[in-house]
Structure formats: C-alpha cells, structure tokens
Amino acid sequence: MRLSSTTFVVLAAVLLASGTAVSKADETGVTNVNAVHSPNVLAGVDKRFLRSHHTEDGKAKLSNYDNEERNGLFAAGTLSDMANDMIFRFKMFTKWKANGHLPKAIKKDIPRSLYKAYKIHHRMN
C-alpha cells in the first residue's frame, strides 16, 4: 500500500472516532440542560400583570386613566380629528356621554372649544 493511501485510511479512522465522541458529549449536555428549571415556574409565580393592578379578590382592574387610554376617547389624535370633523365629534360626544363622562370631569383633558361643544351636547341629549 502506498504511503498516501495509508495516511488517508488512518485520518479517516481518526475522524470517525472523534466524530462519535463529540456526538456523545452533545447528548449528555442536552439532558443536563433539561434538568434545570426556573424557581418561578415551579412556584406558580409565572403570571404577569401588565397595565393592571392585582386586587385581593383576585381580579385585575384597570384604573380610569387606563380605560380611557385603551378606548382612545381622549387621545391627541382623536381630539384633533374631533376638531376637524363634526360628524366624528358628534359620535365621540355620544360615546363620552354613554360612558358617563361629565363635562366638568373631562374639562382638563380636552381643548376649551371641545369642552364648550360637549357641554352643550350633554345638556341637549
């Protein structure tokens, strides 16, 4: 046998032997990773209460500010659209009244012109 053929056979045998050893090392590492658990998951503390407040009775309640923000009733874009579009303004005034917003309560949240218009709308309807 030639020297190059012998070298090739030896290198192939070494490569196969080292490949098997590496793959067994990977298998043992994977089983150890699965054994580690977070203490929060085991204790049942994995719930997150985003934008809400957890109360003693177990129900999450949003504050009035969060409810308004979610509905978009007093968002800057909404107020801008109301100033430019009378039909949209009337629809929003109807929603405000349906949600129980009194003119005096929202006076600081809206522009003066919308406050005056809402005050009239609230009295008429």
UniProtKB/Swiss-Prot annotation:
Record's GO cellular component terms: extracellular region; host cell
Cellular location(s): Secreted; Host cell
Coiled coil: none
Disruption phenotype: Leads to the gain of virulence via impairing effector-triggered immunity (ETI) allowed by host resistance (R) protein Rps1d.
Sorted UniProt keywords: Secreted, Signal, Virulence
Classification via InterPro entries: RXLR
Keyword Amino-acid biosynthesis part of the UniProt annotation: no
Signal sequence coordinates: 1-25
Chain ranges for the short sequence motif RxLR-dEER as given in the UniProt record: 48-70
Protein role: Effector that suppresses plant defense responses during the early stages of pathogen infection. Suppresses cell death induced by effectors and PAMPs in plant hosts. Triggers a hypersensitive response (HR) in the presence of Rps1d. Suppresses BAX-induced cell death and enhanced P.capsici infection in Nicotiana benthamiana. Also suppresses effector-triggered immunity induction by associating with Avr1b and Rps1b, suggesting a role in suppressing plant immunity.
UniProt miscellaneous comment: Avh6 is present in P.sojae strains that are avirulent on Rps1d hosts, whereas the gene is deleted from the genome of virulent strains.
Family of the protein in this entry: Belongs to the RxLR effector family.
Protein name: RxLR effector protein Avh6
UniProt lineage: Eukaryota, Sar, Stramenopiles, Oomycota, Peronosporales
Gene behind the chain: Avh6
